[in-house]
């Protein structure tokens, strides 16, 4: 079953979820040296942190996302990546980074990060269009910020 993401106002959630996010922020900013120190700082158990850390995220810059990263597995065929980039640009997406592995067994992994703040269609619709592009084997939304 595919993951389904919801945006929920933290005021209706138990405090535990916000504390898990706080530990992740403290670790990322270097304000605590490890998970043990982080969970003590915010007042939750290590087991609670580990239970929810991969499932609770904060939304950066309010509700409207600015950047998205997609991961693709592409067949090694001339013009495939170009068609995908054209599709993103067609809907006013702005490419920020492209990382491409060398093709092995006629397939290549590619990740593309792009600005979605001015896009004329939703990200879900764009991903569906990319999935339907010739020689696209797989598309995954990796991150949104």
UniProtKB/Swiss-Prot annotation:
Residues 69-144 form the ACT domain. Transmembrane segments: none annotated. InterPro entries: ACT-like_dom_sf (IPR045865), ACT_dom (IPR002912), UPF0735_ACT_dom-cont (IPR008310). HAMAP family: UPF0735. NCBIfam families: PRK04435.1. Belongs to the UPF0735 family. This is UPF0735 ACT domain-containing protein CBO3010/CLC_2906. It comes from Clostridium botulinum (strain Hall / ATCC 3502 / NCTC 13319 / Type A). The lineage of its organism: Bacteria, Bacillati, Bacillota, Clostridia, Eubacteriales.
């Amino acid at each position: 079953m595919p993951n389904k993401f919801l945006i929920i106002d933290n005021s209706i959630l138990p405090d535990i979820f916000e504390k898990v996010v706080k530990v992740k922020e403290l670790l990322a900013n270097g304000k605590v040296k490890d998970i043990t120190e982080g969970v003590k700082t915010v007042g939750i158990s290590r087991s609670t942190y580990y239970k929810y850390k991969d499932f609770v995220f904060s939304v950066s810059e309010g509700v409207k996302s600015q950047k998205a990263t997609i991961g693709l597995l592409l067949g090694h065929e001339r013009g495939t990546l170009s068609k995908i980039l054209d599709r993103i640009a067609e809907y006013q997406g702005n490419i920020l980074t492209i990382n491409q592995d060398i093709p092995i067994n006629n397939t290549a992994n590619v990740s593309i990060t792009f600005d979605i703040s001015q896009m004329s269609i939703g990200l879900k619709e764009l991903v569906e269009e990319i999935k339907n592009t010739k020689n696209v084997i797989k598309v995954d939304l990796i991150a949104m910020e």
